[in-house]
């Protein structure tokens, strides 16, 4: 948290993990894990260089290997605590986890807003879960996620 003119300002940087093996293979990943590719590691290290002058107090990330590896690559050489939380994981796609995207979304199939994947979550579930986690660490935050 940074203080500016008597007001505490909290800045959030929302960063997506680098490319994963499943990204490259066109497979759906939410809660299932897939390691970063060499390109994914390189992407994270490059972002770390671009953010080198940005002061971070703490890093919250999902418990997925790809998120933790991305955070470690970005923050390499910096004394920033990384706090993994399962509540910051991506959307669970349930039975569709690790399936090929082209098989699920063939012929332009689109799922309606609010659709809950069998054994998984819908967008509202994710927003509620992530919001609850962020409010736990920042109780006075005023936040809206859409």
Where are the language model's segments positioned?
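Short coil/turn segments at beta-strand junctions that form active-site/ligand-binding loops
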Residues: 10, 55-57, 141-146
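Short, hydrophobic/glycine-enriched beta-strand segments
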Residues: 11-17
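Active-site-adjacent alpha-helix immediately C-terminal to a catalytic or transition-state-stabilizing loop
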Residues: 21-22, 68-69, 78, 132-146
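A short acidic, helix-capping loop that chelates divalent metal ions and anchors anionic groups
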Residues: 23-24, 91-96, 113-117
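Phosphate-coordination/substrate-recognition cap region in phosphate-metabolizing enzymes
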Residues: 46-109
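Short glycine/proline- and acidic residue-enriched helix-loop micro-motifs
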Residues: 106-125
